[in-house]
Amino acid sequence: MIRVGINGYGTIGKRVADAVAAQPDMTVAGVAKTSPNFEATQARKRGFDLYTAVEDRADQFPAAGIETAGPVDDLIADSDVVVDATPSGVGAENRSRYAAHDTPAIYQGGEDASVADVSFNARANFEAAADADHVRVVSCNTTGLSRLLAPLREQYGIEKVRATLVRRGGDPGQTDRGPINDILPDPITIPSHHGPDVNTIFPDLDIDTLGMKVPATLMHMHSINVTLERDPDAADVRDVLAGQSRIMLLDDDLGIDGTGPLKEYAQDMGRPRGDLWENCLWGESVTMDGRDFYCFQAIHQESDVVPENVDAVRAIAGDADAAESIATTNDALGI
């Protein structure tokens, strides 16, 4: 069993902890929190050993009636792999701590690519992370783009990618995010950071990305145009995408016309926290015009990187190849 520590038990960390706990070959060594909030309480209720991430705040946990197992360094030392799910920038600060314990670490997409030996997407470059000490799972949007582009590239070749990302202003629990009543080019300059981030997975890919922020919390939306090297018909492309385990091709007759019904669909399916780990791609939007491919896809920013973190653990451990790991993760989560 691979012992996985999770440093940071917020939006991503708590989901990764549950996903790791569901795997047949992994166990949660513990989770670390900076403060004794409701998430810390729930971590203990779920049976996870809780470690304190900030020494100066360690006494706040017993004062709040929350039992802890020790400082985060104890968790790192006791883990085969640590998933760093701390806020952007904190992971880079933690890098030396993981190195001091000789514990491999997985970082999130909010960190600069230089924090890791390799940026990771299970569908696109699983083998690149084999035996690495520091791996960065790319961001939610880059994950969604990589999952889509990998099969298109393999089947048809790609000449050029153009993607407009309509991004949610904040997660449902982020009361300090916005905009509230505005539509923002974000950034105003082109490209947005997503294109260069995709190039950490596909270094030679020609891609332009534009970003926007809108007053929504549920999901991101991508408007995609890819000029392929071949000119397949739309039905053929739909079949290829339908065969991807982490692309949910939405049938027309489902009546899902936006991200609101999508989240309702996830809840009706019994998904934990209403999570959608897959790209949600409207089958009806798949269009070919000559060699130009078009589609719309929605990305659940709180959860699509979760299975990627699980696969990154196996890649580092060297216990499975890409197909085996993806299948095991998917089966355990119900993807």
From Swiss-Prot:
Where, by residue number, does D-glyceraldehyde 3-phosphate bind? 139-141, 194-195
Q: Which GO terms describe its cellular component?
A: cytoplasm
Q: Which reaction does it catalyse?
A: D-glyceraldehyde 3-phosphate + phosphate + NADP(+) = (2R)-3-phospho-glyceroyl phosphate + NADPH + H(+); D-glyceraldehyde 3-phosphate + phosphate + NAD(+) = (2R)-3-phospho-glyceroyl phosphate + NADH + H(+)
Does the keyword Oxidoreductase feature in the UniProt annotation? yes
Q: Which UniProt keywords apply?
A: Cytoplasm, Glycolysis, NAD, NADP, Oxidoreductase
Q: Which residues form the active site?
A: 140 (nucleophile)
Entry's Gene Ontology molecular function annotations: 4-hydroxy-tetrahydrodipicolinate reductase; glyceraldehyde-3-phosphate dehydrogenase (NAD+) (phosphorylating) activity; glyceraldehyde-3-phosphate dehydrogenase (NADP+) (phosphorylating) activity; NAD binding; NADP binding
Q: Name one GO biological process term.
A: glycolytic process
Binding residues annotated for NAD(+), in chain numbering: 11-12, 110, 168, 301
Q: List the pathway annotation.
A: Carbohydrate degradation; glycolysis; pyruvate from D-glyceraldehyde 3-phosphate: step 1/5
**Enzyme Commission no:** 1.2.1.59
Q: Under which name does UniProt file this protein?
A: Glyceraldehyde-3-phosphate dehydrogenase
Species annotation: Halobacterium salinarum (strain ATCC 700922 / JCM 11081 / NRC-1)
Q: Which gene encodes it?
A: gap
